[in-house]
Amino acid sequence: MEFREQVLDLLAEVAENNIVKENPDVEIFEEGIIDSFQTVGLLLEIQNKLDIEVSIMDFDRDEWATPNKIVEALEELR
């Protein structure tokens, strides 16, 4: 499975919403698709399933505002 697809699948699972796959430019925080609890869950799932460690201190809502931006950020951290 392609890395981008893995990230979008993970994001859809955490968000419990496929909009993140259908519209990867959707503002996930502004639209209320992911809340603060889900954000922590997302970071844990990224570590567990993708073996990429992202500390909460490195997490920036502006840089991680859309699914596309999340994929880009994680590709840099791989």
From Swiss-Prot:
It holds the Pfam family PP-binding. 4'-phosphopantetheine is transferred from CoA to a specific serine of apo-DCP. Belongs to the DltC family. It comes from Staphylococcus epidermidis (strain ATCC 35984 / DSM 28319 / BCRC 17069 / CCUG 31568 / BM 3577 / RP62A). Its main location: cytoplasm. SUPFAM superfamilies: ACP-like (SSF47336). Coiled coil: none annotated. GO terms for molecular function: D-alanyl carrier activity. Keywords: Cell wall biogenesis/degradation, Cytoplasm, Phosphopantetheine, Phosphoprotein. This is D-alanyl carrier protein. It comes from the Bacteria. Pathway: Cell wall biogenesis; lipoteichoic acid biosynthesis. GO terms for biological process: cell wall organization; lipoteichoic acid biosynthetic process. The lineage of its organism: Bacteria, Bacillati, Bacillota, Bacilli, Bacillales. Residues 1-78 form the Carrier domain. It is found in: Cytoplasm. NCBIfam families: dltC (TIGR01688), PRK05087.1 (NF003464). The gene is dltC. GO terms for cellular component: cytoplasm. The modification O-(pantetheine 4'-phosphoryl)serine is found at residue 36. InterPro entries: ACP-like_sf, DltC, PP-bd_ACP.
